[in-house]
From Swiss-Prot:
Presence of the UniProt keyword Transmembrane helix in the record: yes
Cofactor(s) needed: Cu cation
Enzyme class per UniProt: translocase
Mitochondrial matrix topological domain residue ranges: 49-62
Name listed for the protein in its UniProt record: Cytochrome c oxidase subunit 2
GO biological process terms held by the UniProt record: ATP synthesis coupled electron transport
Known role: Component of the cytochrome c oxidase, the last enzyme in the mitochondrial electron transport chain which drives oxidative phosphorylation. The respiratory chain contains 3 multisubunit complexes succinate dehydrogenase (complex II, CII), ubiquinol-cytochrome c oxidoreductase (cytochrome b-c1 complex, complex III, CIII) and cytochrome c oxidase (complex IV, CIV), that cooperate to transfer electrons derived from NADH and succinate to molecular oxygen, creating an electrochemical gradient over the inner membrane that drives transmembrane transport and the ATP synthase.
TM stretches of this protein: 27-48, 63-82
Cofactor remark from the record: Binds a dinuclear copper A center per subunit.
Topology in membrane: Multi-pass membrane protein
Family named by the database record: Belongs to the cytochrome c oxidase subunit 2 family.
Amino acid sequence: MATWANLGLQNSSSPLMEQLNFFHDHTVLILIMITVMITYVMGMLFFNKFTNRYLLHGQTIEIIWTILPAIILMFIAFPSLRLLYLLDEINSPLITLKAIGHQWYWSYEYSNFMNLEFDSYMIPTNELDLNGFRLLDVDNRIILPLNNQIRILVTATDVLHSWTVPSLGVKIDATPGRLNQTNFLINQSGLFFGQCSEICGANHSFMPIVIESIPMNYFIKWVSSQLN
């Protein structure tokens, strides 16, 4: 989850987020190399006494500054395209979860089970436990099994919303009249927090998302208790 004064990305809890972190570091490394090189070249230009008689016409340097950026962009584009395909790939999901955005709460339906659905509201600050997280805890958490492919279908009933859990690398728009989908796999047990990431009205900041990841045997017991 997000912590105070954290300048980096959240710790990854899914393979997709690990790949996103790697791509971020890869891109930042390239940007640092470009910045250092440009700073060095600009410094050399300003602090030397040489003159160039061919300043107005330099075909060689024009070829270099055309080809070199193209090569650099290829090193960024290919990993980016690979990630885009991974984010859209659906790999035989074990469970399908449907999230429906409302002003200003979420509804969830487990499509694999009959009559397993609930609404999820933020717990007000005056009703929060001492160990609760302000503006992040909900009355009904999403319970999902560990180390299994999960497909999520997202839509909305009124205005645009966005279902987002940063530590899982998931962000998908909830659009009225349209069903969007993505998949993810949680490789760590625990609680994962997110929020609506599309401004949707006065209480937009009061639409938290909480996922509780548990082993499969505990998930089966939870499903049985809910259905009974």
